[in-house]
Amino acid sequence: MPKYKHVEDILKIMRNVEQVRNIGIIAHVDHGKTTTSDALLAHAGILSPKLAGEARALDYLDVEQQRGITVKAANVSLYHEYKGKPYVINLIDTPGHVDFSGKVTRSLRVLDGAILVVDAVEGVMTQTETVLRQALEELVRPLLFINKVDRLIKELKLSPQEIQQRIVQIIKDVNERILTFAPDPEIAKKWLLDPAKGHVALGSAKDKWGITIPMAQEKGIKFSDIVEAYAKGSKDAIEELFHKAPLHETLLDMVVRWVPNPREAQKYRVPRLWKGDINSELGKAMLNCDPEGPLVVFINDMRLDPHTKRLVATGRVWAGTATAGKEVWLVNAQKPGKILQVSIYMGPDREIVDYVTAGNIVAMLGLDDARAGETLVDINYKDQAAPFEQLHYVSEPVVTVAIEPKNPRDLPKLIEALRTLSIEDPNLKVTINQETGEYLLSGMGMLHIEIALTQLKEVYGLEVKVSPPVITYRETVRKPGEKVEGKSPNKHNKLYITVEPLEKEVIEMIQKGEITDDQDPRERAKVLRDKVNWDADTARRIWAVDEENFNIFIDKTVGVQHLREVKDTILAGWRLAMKEGPLAKEPVRGVKVILWDAVIHEDPAHRGPAQLYPAVRNAVYASMLTDSPTLLEPWQKLDIRVPNEYIGAVTGVITKHRGKILEVIDMGGQARIVAAVPIAESFELPMELRSVTAGRAFWGTEFYGWEPVPDQLLPELIRKIRERKGLPPEPPKAEDFLGP
């Protein structure tokens, strides 16, 4: 089969948006997502059908091939005929492992529909729920593929009736979550899965067959025939199944029939996902997915091309047509840019083309200043430009290692490699410890960091030394602190500040993007008044929102002279104080900083950053230290499946590691244990769980949240962090910041 059978055909169809579908395949790790993708790719003439299932075509990083899990979200355009009509299906592969959920979120923004793959034996797991919730929040329509049905017959030896019960239960579980997570009850009702209509497929991605109820009726396939084929272990009968009901045909037919085309989808997705004026020319062009309108592209992926060593920006064209030479405005970066080349993806390779029209996925060269999450618009429309909402990732980087090259001469190469890695994956944070000069790499878990380290070795040829992993903590306050006076070094400026805990509901609203730094202040005040009963005056007086660490600055002063002129300087000082708290120089999280009064010198020479930064910092630190400051530590949620006889052993391991059991669910012979443990205690867990369950526990993990460190562990932990950072072991007291 020729490798690129259909590039010209694909381009022709892409122009007609009714014949385009943008889909992804989402799942819990190891439920068969990549194998399902391969079955689709074989059909598109990109892989030979014999290799599908073994080849893992979308996993084109060597790391992924070795670990057998998908890390980079790749994209490919497929060609499919349904009822005699040709369609282009843009398939975006999304990682299923929890450490990469940032990439999943970015991929979802460019999709209109998703095939949710669920393992028939394991059912709906934590990560299944997480990716489904993210898809629904991004208004991506889910369809269901229940994979590994052969395991129910071969391994669990279930009767046809028991298999039916298991399948009905999985559909019910998914539907319950659609009702819970869909942002709009109308959409939830419309998107509920109805197997009789063909919203659900069953099959085996490994054996490459799949059926829906309408298709089985049409082709005369009985479920009892499938059970018999596997029960007998008949290779011919299974091969026959593949010929009668090939998985690619079943899934792609389902996609064409039930996933909305880009124009239909943009009508309800744009108003919810884009922050601009829907009635502007840009807004109308996006609502109508108009290829003749001004260009708007949302970038979901930045990646280094291994051949050209240039950065490739991949994204979805929401309006207009992307062409080489097009001048654009980068809305978040607030910079102009120029597209030098446009192409479409065929697996890891890009095919250069003249143009890509609205509703399709494009890869572009030349936009080195862009980052994942950037919005590009035609430069002539920059006044109407607004970003798509900030993407909300589910986790935050919480594990850090220090790295240095084994050969000191490689340092410039390491710096460049780290810069590129952090562009490709915004969930990897690279920082330099100013005191020690170390390069610090932070990620969402040890697996996330290990993969980055492997890439340093394999892609960049770097040998590096790595420190043991360090957990990132956050500083916060438990009760409102006292009002304190912060003086500038020249004593001419005084700020009167208190620090209080920020309500949990407000932190969640910042996380979800309901409250942002650049929001219209009146709109923000209304949201806070209506949803969390803030009084109107306080809500209107918010000066800034720290979206990274969830803090708010409020100005409650009355009639202070010269305050407006130094507002930006005060806020810059506040942001610096939020980056490193007083206890252990860890970021400050979840606090309200209130400015009650101020004395500002009239001469600008006496009120610059060198004077005001220390005044803000000293006041914030002193107020935090007056009343019960503490550290928050990151926790991980575990979703464990285990035979019933091991429940006691598993709960024992969890509690030994300061964990808590959230629920235990009986699943008939198997138990599902949902638990949470501090990440600091999680490094040994996999080995211990395997040993106490004789290797029979499966589990998934995801970020659980931040919890206060127990008081009895706090002093020792603060001392350790301070010593590691080269600080005096004892934390400062409030009076240390209140100078004479």
Curated annotation (Swiss-Prot):
Belongs to the TRAFAC class translation factor GTPase superfamily. Classic translation factor GTPase family. EF-G/EF-2 subfamily. This is Elongation factor 2. GO terms for cellular component: cytosol; ribonucleoprotein complex. It comes from the Archaea. InterPro entries: EFG_II, EFG_III/V, EFG_V-like, EFTu-like_2, G_TR_CS, P-loop_NTPase, Ribosomal_Su5_D2-typ_SF, Ribsml_uS5_D2-typ_fold_subgr. The modification Diphthamide is found at H606. One of its GO terms (molecular function) is GTP binding. Pfam families: EFG_C, EFG_III, EFG_IV, GTP_EFTU, GTP_EFTU_D2. GTP binds at residues 27-34, 93-97, 147-150. Catalyzes the GTP-dependent ribosomal translocation step during translation elongation. During this step, the ribosome changes from the pre-translocational (PRE) to the post-translocational (POST) state as the newly formed A-site-bound peptidyl-tRNA and P-site-bound deacylated tRNA move to the P and E sites, respectively. Catalyzes the coordinated movement of the two tRNA molecules, the mRNA and conformational changes in the ribosome. Residues 18-263 form the tr-type G domain. The lineage of its organism: Archaea, Thermoproteota, Thermoprotei, Desulfurococcales, Desulfurococcaceae.
